[in-house]
Curated annotation (Swiss-Prot), chains A, B:
Record NCBIfam families: asnS, PRK03932.1
Name of this protein: Asparagine--tRNA ligase
Keyword annotations from UniProtKB, A to Z: Aminoacyl-tRNA synthetase, ATP-binding, Cytoplasm, Ligase, Nucleotide-binding, Protein biosynthesis
Cited InterPro entries: Aa-tRNA-synt_II (IPR004364), aa-tRNA-synth_II (IPR006195), aa-tRNA-synth_II/BPL/LPL (IPR045864), Asn-tRNA-ligase (IPR004522), Asp/Asn-tRNA-synth_IIb (IPR002312), NA-bd_OB-fold (IPR012340), NA-bd_OB_tRNA (IPR004365)
Record flagged with keyword Cell inner membrane: no
Spans through the membrane: none
Gene Ontology molecular function: asparagine-tRNA ligase activity; ATP binding; nucleic acid binding
Gene Ontology biological process terms, A to Z: asparaginyl-tRNA aminoacylation
Domain of life: Bacteria
Length: 469, 469
């Protein structure tokens, strides 16, 4: 086989412009079927959900070689791209030469033709990219990342890397993982008997970040608009289909945006991502719609159709109380001051308004210290974007720009000033109105793929008792 | 001041198309000078290195307000964009209204007009984005990230997220940070008295990854081509201008690429990034050239000019031995089997070839277990891209695709098979020739910015005894 012949990606070959030409296709065997005269091999190379049909005339190929071509094997094929006579594909490759790169013993290869449960595939996360489902999901994941970078780049916002290892634990977003190089069998101790973190790698106690927001704000107060896109961590012992210990987050932070501008940005942003998916991933989305979630495409179009409803928390509570009065049953009680549960959010979105909702002006007690206090002294300019099926997809706020108010709120919430001296500096010197929000990347992917378990939209999920691979 | 008037970014206003129009500019004061009749304010909003000159006729503004406009203050200005009479700028804004968002007390604001050392600025990493130098660096950092995504996206390679928290420590790339939720004051113990990591969050001992390569290969063996772009960690106690404990790495991994293809990819990739910088960041690069590194632009063009020299390690050693014979002095000894030091790499690039060098076919003893063994049984298909000033900028290899050879090499290098069962599966089932490499993002930035300390090209550097902010 001619090693120097350029490889053609199956996605490109399927477009049909190369019909009549000799091409070189490489990929993994999905299925092989046929009769005594001819074999049909469905080959996939990851460039598309669609396989290329390889037609091998058995008169031209060694039977021993052909018998090695089983599901999961990797082969290279040279042949002529022709219009297909069969149903199910428009073009196929009439093979003139086949090279086997790697076999896959049918007796042990875990991914045979038959369907597998998602649970089983999680146990072989190193092989699941070879399935149709996960090829689809990882391609969509890629496209959503590119959409995000493109959106912000076009706005003139800069991609900014917040640190992962942090000595700060004031964000209040959740439990943290400790990062250390101390030997647990010979921990250094202070005179008082405490672990002496001055001897640790960073000379202090350090953890994995739960958010890059505070550092991102420092950059926004100089560069104008920035966004982070990086991993964040939560050490909560939450074994649910919605929680990961390690996940990716996008956090734009923009100077001179007030809460209304922030809502505009969030709505434009998420619609841009969904539109990108429909424009660029339709083959993959159709596969998921067919196999997992018949309503997926309708749900994606649903969020594009109308402006999101903008709703103050207080009004939202009134609607939910009204619903309860009219006989709607919720698991969790609803009252002014309560943190909304997913059931409440979904009621507002799916039943009451039938459109995504941006809820604002939450009671200050249930939100973080850095959110801008409203004139009523009771509510803050937080905003959550609520979506069908998944509830909260974005959380953000206008930030408190006033130094004195910020210090007062930090004190109220028990955040020590000495831990946020640098954050306070941004309000001490040249403060400006600014806003931002966070989007959990995997939450977005749950929405765009229609998958129901977050472990299926990240390549190697980290959850309690699970860090394999 | 009209709150609803749309803000114009200074980068856009400076293009001049808006001359004669009333615009709204917001940003931070770099300097203010003037006389009794008029003040000139240099305003920067992060959209460009260039400031907008604001002209304030003192007859129209309150003296008390004007006195608050000092270096570091944040203001909004409405005024008419006019062609400038003064030298140094083509347009300026004749202010009709000024709003002060935040003052910056000259008695305490750390960034006064005078120059600051880079060492001092590292201590106020939360404020250094407000300097010209770091505005420039973070904009270039953004552009290089966008260049990287664009390059791979255009090739049809997928952005793939390898896990950060890992139970695997077989890559051999360096010391690792432990990740734990165990309470050091009440560590669970096994019957044998060891720390019982089964009680830790993930049910086992976990660390921060040193590379996403092995997981990336799993994806390449299904999706064809992927790249990672994420943080990686090294716990080495290296307090040098070239080392970080937390840094970002780009690791493409591509099926069906052999070593020559891999060299082509690396060369095309890095030239693409450098060309992008010259095309999109010239104002910022010119600033760095003027203030830090007069040879910067020449060095950037240098790598674009010629094909990189491709040189086998054995031949490289011969050249270096010849140089020693001719009187060249190196600090470290040179002999076949030695790991090259930066001085050797730079000699080859800067003195001998006067072009970047891709060195290949290293002795297997000094490279990782996963590199493809050559037929000589002594060398492996590793490749390092060597650059002027910084030495190695990329390290990669063709990967060992043969199951038996890979197992043998793992055993030789002391990598336990039980720890890489999943990695070996990729060679057990449908293996394929494939290659990849790693580029340290901050190494690229050192090259593109000409900065000499790696702590100055990442927003919040993490190094021994340093995790502030």
């Amino acid at each position: 086989m001619d090693k120097k012949m350029k490889r053609t990606r199956i996605a490109d070959a399927l477009h049909g412009g190369l019909v009549g030409q000799e091409i070189n296709i490489k990929g993994w065997v999905r299925t092989k079927r046929g009769n005594k005269a001819v074999n049909f091999i469905a080959l996939n190379d990851g460039s598309t959900i669609h396989n290329m049909q390889i037609v091998a005339d058995l008169a031209s190929f060694d039977a021993a070689q052909m018998s090695q071509i089983t599901t999961g094997a990797c082969i290279g094929v040279i042949g002529t791209l022709v219009e297909s006579q069969g149903a199910g594909q428009s073009v196929e490759v009439q093979a003139s030469a086949i090279e086997i790169y790697g076999t896959a013993d049918p007796a042990t290869y875990p991914l045979q033709k038959k369907g597998h449960t998602l649970e089983f595939l999680r146990e072989i996360a190193h092989l699941r990219p070879r399935t149709n489902t996960f090829g689809v999901i990882y391609r969509i994941r890629h496209h959503m990342a590119i959409a995000i970078h493109t959106f912000f780049h076009n706005k003139g916002y800069y991609y900014f890397h917040a640190p992962l290892i942090t000595a700060s634990d004031c964000e209040g977003a959740g439990q943290m993982f400790q990062v250390t190089t101390l030997n647990p069998d010979s921990l250094p101790r202070t005179e008082e008997g405490q672990v002496d973190y001055r001897k640790d790698f960073f000379g202090r106690h350090t953890s994995l970040t739960v958010s890059g927001q505070l550092e991102g704000e420092m950059a926004a107060m100089a560069l104008g608009g920035i966004y982070t896109f990086g991993p964040t961590f939560r050490a909560e012992n939450s074994n649910t289909p919605r929680h990961l210990a390690e996940f990716w987050m996008i956090e734009p932070e923009v100077a001179f945006l007030e809460i209304e501008d922030n809502m505009d940005l969030a709505e434009e942003f998420i619609k841009y991502c969904v539109q990108w998916a429909l424009d660029n991933c339709m083959d993959d989305i159709s596969f998921l719609s067919e196999h997992f979630d018949k309503e997926l495409i309708d749900r994606l179009k649903f969020v594009l159709e109308k402006p999101f409803v903008r709703l103050a928390y207080t009004e939202g509570i009134r609607i939910l109380e009204e619903a309860v009065k009219n006989g709607v049953k919720f698991e969790f009680p609803i009252y002014w001051g309560a943190d909304l549960a997913s059931e409440h959010e979904r009621y507002l979105v799916e039943v009451h308004f039938k459109t995504p909702v941006i809820m604002t002006d939450y009671p200050k007690e249930i939100k973080s210290f850095y959110m801008k206090l409203n004139d009523d002294g009771k509510t803050v300019r937080g905003m959550d974007v609520l979506f069908p099926k998944i509830g909260e997809i974005i959380g953000g706020s206008e930030r408190e720009a006033d130094y004195d108010k910020l210090v007062a709120r930090a004190n109220e919430m028990g955040v020590p000033e000495k831990d946020i001296w640098w954050y306070l500096d941004s309000r001490r010197y040249g403060t400006a109105p600014h806003s931002g929000f966070g989007l959990g990347f995997e939450r977005l992917l749950l929405f765009v793929t229609g998958m129901s378990n977050i472990r299926d939209v990240i390549p190697f999920p980290r959850t309690p008792n699970n860090a394999e691979f």
